Amino acid sequence: MTYTFGIELEISGLSQQETRSGLLNRNIKGFKVVNDDSHGVTAEIVSCPMAYGMDAMEQINKVSNALQDMGATIMSNCGFHVHISNAPLMDGVDANDWTRKSIEHFENTGNYYSENLSDPMDAVLIKDVMYRYTKMQNGYNGINSMLPRSRRDMTMARVLVLEKIEAANTIRELQSATHGKFSTINLQPWTTHGTIEFRQAAGTIEADKILHWVRFLLNLIDHSANYRIDQSASREIQHNTPTQPFRRGARVGVQYTMMRAVDGATTRQIMDATG
């Protein structure tokens, strides 16, 4: 499956107008320049959605070269965010053709292209992605080993809590398991933009670093979808409850045991049993 993506590059050293004019003069399409209130960030470059392929790689190389040519710099607190669509391209849709249509649509309307997308991934898949990313956070060759110290458990991308992810079974519960927008994986755009935002990467205007990180995230999702999730099986999540968390014989314990039974219990049955 091919999931589309978009990038957000925070830079320093150039004003928004300078950046906007520089991209326009170089005829670079598919990007807009917006304000960012983070300290030391003077402009943020936001791409339209793209599907990974030669056309997307070419656009990212163009904007990278342009920013370097214009004299953009990166401060230690600059970030690089990646939005990945929660829905893959439909079967048979060419990635390069989709990217070209997305850029054209963005240039003509200022809006993001969302045609030819399949059904969104379900909670089981995104939960596995969040679990694996968080599980890999520390340790040898973990996420943190790829990032400078300034991007490790920082306030703009707080590390998720593994136990909260494990306890979540729905998209809403997974959203609640994060720290909101300022999380390593932000699920707030799920309903507003149909994307998952990965916020932890360090700021960069080097195309190789941008593309490597995008590929890493896309591979993370692909591996979960293709090798860890049984696509043919029921997506019902089993959640085991404790046999008896209450004092034996206590009224609440009797109620709990009755409700935990396979067929549950009616209100009348519980009232008859407990008085």
Cite the ranges covered by each PLM segment.
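Short acidic, hydrophobic short linear motifs in intrinsically disordered regions
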Residues: G264-T274
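Short alpha-helical segments that sit at the start of domains
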Residues: I237-V254
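C-terminal accessory/tail domains of diverse enzymes
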Residues: M1-T73, A87-L89, V93-N240
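Active-site histidine-anchored catalytic micro-motif
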Residues: M75-N77
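Short helix-capping/hinge SLiMs at alpha-helix to coil transitions
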Residues: M259-V262
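Basic amphipathic recognition helices
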Residues: E206, G253-Y256
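A generic structural signal for well-ordered alpha-helical surface patches
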Residues: R215-L218, G253, R268
